[in-house]
A protein has these predicted regions:
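Residue position within the beta-strands of beta-propeller blades
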Residues: 29, 73, 126-127
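Short, solvent-exposed loop/turn segments at conserved positions within beta-propeller repeat blades
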Residues: 81-88, 133-138
Length: 166
């Protein structure tokens, strides 16, 4: 544990924060280049919870409103620039961040937002920017109706057009 790294993560590198709907002390913090961090004491201390995965770069984090033990994570930084790192799709944790599974959209490179339907956890939308400096990839707005097992593009067209916000 390095307090300086914690400070840098919180101030400089934060990409997104999701706060547990039933416990204000539990936060998940997605960072552009330091993975995902969890606090159970409103930010006094943090624990890295994504260090053993295939990418360190994240863009968004979302808690399932119907089941707060389910965490969705979009990988790849959600900001443009020459310094950004890309990710490899959407990840899901069913145990509050203890373990993760890649749920697809591996060619998206930059997922900037994930929304879970408030009444149906099987319906998820993911905004994909796609590769920043090349055409193609999985870019656009994607929807899953089976809990992230399969994704269908519902918005997006050209090989250079991605989605950053829902």
């Amino acid at each position: 544990y390095d307090r300086r790294r914690q400070r840098q993560m919180c101030i400089r590198d934060r990409a997104d924060i999701a706060i547990h709907p039933n416990n204000d002390n539990v936060w998940y913090v997605a960072t552009g280049s330091s993975g995902v961090w969890k606090t159970e004491n409103s930010g006094t201390t943090y624990t890295p919870i994504f260090d053993n995965e295939t990418t360190y770069s994240t863009g968004c984090v979302t808690i399932d409103p119907s089941d707060p033990s389910i965490i969705w994570l979009g990988t790849g930084e959600n900001v443009g620039g020459r310094h950004v790192a890309f990710g490899d799709g959407v990840f899901k944790s069913e145990n509050g961040g203890k373990s993760w599974k890649n749920m697809g959209l591996r060619k998206s490179e930059h997922i900037s937002e994930i929304i879970v339907h408030p009444n149906n956890s099987n319906i998820i939308w993911a905004a994909s920017q796609g590769p920043l400096w090349s055409p193609g990839g999985e870019r656009g707005l994607y929807k899953s109706i089976d809990g992230g097992e399969n994704w269908k593009k519902v918005l997006g067209g050209g090989k250079w057009t991605g989605v950053t916000d829902i």
